[in-house]
């Protein structure tokens, strides 16, 4: 669809945004059982998103897995919030049109969003001229920023200065396009909102990473189709 001549004219090849969104798995917490087949109090380890306490039993992705969908992993968005079995859907948006030009679905991990972003942007970065990638502060990590620069991608990433030093310095924030990238990148939330509400992907009805990945890509394409009539109508006559 994006390769069609009229659609291709809507796209720039220089400015993009990336983000991720949680997709709840089609599996209940009752299916999240010890991998060794035993019950009991497992200590669990990892960050705040890796473990949760269920009626005195400690469960984590290291010690437990869903018997309904082994690809789904336990995730808690923040302290005091309910832990759920989830995947992470990732989208790459072209900034001028707001169309989604690539997607990924991955298991939950602390590095999943940044790895998916690198995977998606690499195909667009294979050119002499630098391109830009806008992202929220969750992507502000030194290794990710350095990898983008190696690919000749300008990291228009929001600065995260809470309890640490940001990897984004003045040479980036002073760039004329940085503020524009930070403003436009938020439009990807419109796509995620449509995918999760209108297309029903807030909680998938499929099991297995490959199937959920396919469904996410399909609904992103549907979002683009909904957007296209307006975009094509705004296109200046040839």
Where are these regions (language model features)?
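Polybasic low-complexity intrinsically disordered regions
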Residues: 1-147, 223
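Generic detector of well-ordered alpha-helical segments enriched in charged/polar residues
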Residues: 2, 33, 51-55, 169, ...
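Short loop/turn segments at secondary-structure transitions that flank enzyme active sites
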Residues: 24, 29-31, 97, 154, ...
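Helix-centered, glycine/charged polyanion-binding patches within enzymatic domains
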Residues: 39-41, 46, 137-210, 214-217
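Residue-level micro-sites within transmembrane alpha helices that shape
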Residues: 93, 188-189, 195, 223-226
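A short, flexible helix-boundary coil/loop motif
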Residues: 198, 202, 229-238
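Aspartic protease catalytic domain
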Residues: 218, 222-225, 231
């Amino acid at each position: 669809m994006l390769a069609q001549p009229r659609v291709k004219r809507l796209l720039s090849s220089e400015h993009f945004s990336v983000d991720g969104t949680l997709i709840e798995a089609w599996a209940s917490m009752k299916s999240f059982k010890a991998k060794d087949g035993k019950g009991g109090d497992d200590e669990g380890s990892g960050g705040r998103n890796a473990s949760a306490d269920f009626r005195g039993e400690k469960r984590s992705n290291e010690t437990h897995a869903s018997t309904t969908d082994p690809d789904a992993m336990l995730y808690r968005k923040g302290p005091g919030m309910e832990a759920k079995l989830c995947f992470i859907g990732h989208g790459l948006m072209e900034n001028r049109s707001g169309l989604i030009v690539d997607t990924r679905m991955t298991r939950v991990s602390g590095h999943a969003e940044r790895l998916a972003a690198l995977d998606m942007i690499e195909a667009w970065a294979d050119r002499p001229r630098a391109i830009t990638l806008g992202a929220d502060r969750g992507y502000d990590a030194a290794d990710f920023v350095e990898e983008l620069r190696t690919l000749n991608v300008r990291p228009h990433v929001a600065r995260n200065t809470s309890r640490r030093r940001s990897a984004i310095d003045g040479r980036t924030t002073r760039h004329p396009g940085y503020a524009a990238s930070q403003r436009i990148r938020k439009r990807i939330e419109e796509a995620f909102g449509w995918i999760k509400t209108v297309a029903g992907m807030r909680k998938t009805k499929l099991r297995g990473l490959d199937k959920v990945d396919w469904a996410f890509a399909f609904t992103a394409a549907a979002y683009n189709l909904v957007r296209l009539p307006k975009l094509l109508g705004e296109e200046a006559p040839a």
